[in-house]
């Protein structure tokens, strides 16, 4: 299919009249010049183990829910039981811990209200066996037929089952292509957490520090 001149002209007129679609504030002023919330975009979070990839993602998702009432659909097999994940979100929402070892922890009433809020804004899908990326996306779409969703998260992509006899490059290329098409169809925010490969974990700079990982 070739895009017609009329389609292009109408698009250009719309941009001239209404401007480009811009992101909205994260509620974190120092971050906004570099990153904002915008539907229809893919955000990939990567980094070495235990540096806070999931925590960073959850906090941003929580802020989007708190500011704009976003509803999220997640696949996060490394963060079970689900109750612990809801506690993390509730603590972020309140800005206080629920840990009984802290004297200034959140009150029980506020804690339970925050957990209820988290459950209303975050839905977690689980599978009995490790799914493929296509199976996860299909399950997301089935759920989205009955519930309006603003954002999606897969954490991590590496956990998903890869086809046999397919190179890692081809697998990730196809997976990201399918994710992009999903985003275009549904106009959602999409967070994708990716662990760096073994080779990236082994690399060191001349001073012995690890270089920043990439895809």
Model-inferred region functions:
Residues 123-185:
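Phosphate-binding/switch loop-helix module in NTP-utilizing enzymes
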Residues 32, 67-148:
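Cytosolic-facing regulatory segments adjacent to core modules
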Residues 76, 153, 193:
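Generic enzyme active-site microenvironment
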Residues 64-67, 88, 92-96, 146, ...:
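Conserved, well-folded catalytic cores of nucleic-acid-processing
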Residues 81-86, 95, 161-164, 199-205:
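Switch/connector loops and helix/strand junctions flanking conserved nucleotide-binding motifs
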Residues 2-96:
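The Walker A/P-loop phosphate-binding site
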Residues 32-34, 174-215:
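Phosphate-binding/switch region of NTP-binding enzymes
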């Amino acid at each position: 299919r070739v895009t017609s001149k009329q389609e292009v002209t109408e698009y250009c007129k719309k941009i001239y009249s209404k401007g480009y679609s811009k992101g909205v504030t994260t509620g974190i002023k120092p971050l906004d010049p570099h990153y904002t919330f915008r539907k229809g975009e893919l955000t990939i979070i990567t980094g070495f183990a235990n540096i806070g990839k999931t925590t960073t993602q959850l906090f941003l998702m929580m802020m989007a829910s708190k500011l704009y009432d976003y509803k999220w659909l997640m696949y996060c097999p490394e963060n079970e039981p689900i109750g612990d994940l809801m506690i993390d979100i509730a603590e972020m929402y309140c800005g206080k811990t629920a840990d009984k070892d802290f004297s200034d922890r959140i009150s029980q009433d506020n804690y339970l209200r925050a957990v209820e809020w988290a459950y209303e804004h975050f839905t977690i899908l689980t599978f009995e066996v490790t799914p493929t990326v296509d199976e996860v996306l299909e399950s997301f779409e089935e759920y989205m037929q009955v519930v309006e969703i603003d954002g999606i998260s897969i954490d991590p992509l590496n956990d998903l089952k890869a086809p046999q006899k397919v190179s890692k490059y081809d697998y990730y290329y196809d997976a990201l292509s399918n994710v992009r098409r999903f985003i275009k169809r549904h106009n959602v925010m999409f967070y994708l957490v990716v662990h760096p490969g073994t080779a990236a974990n082994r690399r060191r700079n001349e001073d012995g520090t690890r270089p920043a990982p990439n895809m």
